[in-house]
């Protein structure tokens, strides 16, 4: 018997710096409801989905910086999203900035959670591959200070049972790193999902700008194919505070084929019928890890 589900991606248009969380949650609720009306069992939302992409600014006021982080999840403003998910019977993946205090010390993470159809958090991931830089760089038209505002994740690349599927998460830059995909593939992930905020202009290497979409889709397609997993990527897209963000949110089959792709630079929902048993086609006949992998030759990957 095949295990079928409808997978959705909820792409976000720009979020202005002045836009409130309440306004953003209304938009997320609208996409959640649209996905459920199309029969979706699960929807993927973007990285840092509750605010504008604040690492593009250099903050000197710690209180102002803290205002972009969540200290509890769900908090009062975000709780309606969890309640609506439980009402409609649809799970979701949500990215946000997380602030925790341990031993009197503030710790900040770029975080993503998995929520099941009952509205319960069943998984958490903290972004490991942080891009960008740590200090202000005057030549840039916008900053990319993730290394300043977050520490690398400390949870590894876990895989969780979410309703009927085994799911793993990436956040933005993680999707470019094959090690992330392979760890989740080895752990049996059937769906690998996450969000991104990807500028179409990269100031250090502007000669790559025309390849931004190509590299994004290449990473998603190769990751899915080489690990025999479905994947889904949800972008925050369009012109956000004078920074153009990449579109092309997508759903990819274990064969590497794109089965759904957004066509706008605004809030948009895409869906695809997903047969989880198709993962076996790749894992049994092409990438049979137990039969073909030779890990004794891979040590350099972790040593350097």
UniProtKB/Swiss-Prot annotation:
What EC number(s) does its UniProt record assign?
3.5.1.77
Q: Gene3D superfamilies under this entry?
A: Carbon-nitrogen hydrolase (3.60.110.10)
- Key words, A-Z: Hydrolase
Domain CN hydrolase intervals: 5-276
Catalytic activity annotated for this protein? an N-carbamoyl-D-amino acid + H2O + 2 H(+) = a D-alpha-amino acid + NH4(+) + CO2
Molecular function terms from GO = N-carbamoyl-D-amino acid hydrolase activity
Active site as annotated? 47, 127, 172
Q: What functional role does this protein have?
A: The enzyme catalyzes the hydrolysis of N-carbamoyl-D-amino acids to the corresponding which are useful intermediates in the preparation of beta-lactam antibiotics. Industrial production of beta-lactam antibiotics is now being developed using this enzyme.
What name does the UniProt record give this protein? Answer: N-carbamoyl-D-amino acid hydrolase
């Amino acid at each position: 018997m095949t295990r079928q589900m409808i997978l959705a991606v909820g792409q976000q248009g720009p979020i202005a710096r002045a836009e409130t969380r309440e306004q953003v949650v209304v938009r997320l609720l609208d996409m959640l409801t649209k996905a459920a009306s199309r029969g979706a069992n699960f929807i993927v939302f973007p990285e840092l989905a509750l605010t504008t992409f604040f690492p593009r600014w250099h903050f000197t006021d710690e209180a102002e910086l803290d205002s972009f982080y969540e200290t509890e999840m769900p908090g009062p403003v975000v709780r309606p999203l969890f309640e609506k998910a439980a009402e409609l019977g649809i799970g979701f993946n949500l990215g946000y900035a997380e602030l925790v205090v341990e031993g009197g010390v503030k710790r900040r993470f770029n975080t993503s959670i998995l929520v099941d159809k009952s509205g319960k958090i069943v998984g958490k991931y903290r972004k490991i591959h942080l891009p960008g830089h740590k200090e202000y760089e005057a030549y840039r038209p916008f900053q990319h200070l993730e290394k300043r505002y977050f520490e690398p994740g400390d949870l590894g690349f876990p895989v969780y049972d979410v309703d009927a599927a085994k799911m793993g998460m990436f956040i933005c830059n993680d999707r470019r790193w094959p090690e992330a995909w392979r760890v989740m593939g080895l752990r049996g992930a059937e769906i690998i999902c996450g969000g991104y905020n990807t500028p179409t202009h990269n100031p250090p290497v502007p000669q790559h700008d025309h390849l931004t979409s190509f590299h994004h889709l290449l990473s998603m397609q190769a990751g899915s194919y080489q690990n025999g997993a479905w994947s889904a990527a949800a972008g925050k897209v369009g012109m956000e505070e004078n920074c153009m963000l990449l579109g092309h949110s997508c759903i990819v089959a274990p064969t590497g084929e794109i089965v759904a792709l957004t066509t706008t630079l605004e809030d948009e929902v895409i869906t695809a019928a997903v047969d989880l048993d198709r993962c076996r086609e790749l894992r049994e006949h092409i990438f049979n890890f137990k039969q073909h992998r030779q890990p004794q030759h891979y040590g350099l990957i972790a040593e350097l």
